[in-house]
Amino acid sequence: ADGEYYETMNSVVGKLMEPGSTFKTASIMVAMEDGHINKNTRVDTGDGKWPMYGRIMKDHNWNKGGYGMLNVTRVLMKSSNIGVSRLIDGAYHDCPDKFVRGLNNLGVGLPMDLDIPGSGRPRVYMPKKAKNGHWILPITRNGVPMELGKPDLAWMSIGYALQLPPIYTLAFYNGIANNGRM
């Protein structure tokens, strides 16, 4: 009203967002580091729609017939949701904690030491196995620990079901450009 602009939040460091497709590279790197896949590993992406535990995962070209068989290199080139999620779910479905640990090893899920007011902390939760054998997260809803649902790992692998401030994505890709130094 007074013609002045006031920045109330530094969105780059403070706003939590689902990184979406920009996260696929991190997921693939974790699986490669753990020896589950290599650049020539092939995965069937079908006709662009794939059932994942009661939900349908789609690639952006699902209405044009999808991509069919792709190797890991092409999965990243095409930004295939199905390819990444099937590779990660296949490797880590029974051990999602190893996937999150791999993300942490890349520096993606760990808090950065930013001396900037309002800096956000990533929400990449480490699952642990409960006594009933289900995977639970270290967060609660109405006092009850939340379970890691069967489709959650697949969606996490393509940048959903987790949140990062945008600076984390920037730092990750800068690390790649700088030979691993973030």
PLM regions: where:
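Beta-lactam-recognizing serine transpeptidase/beta-lactamase-like catalytic domain environment
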Residues: A1-S21, A26-M182
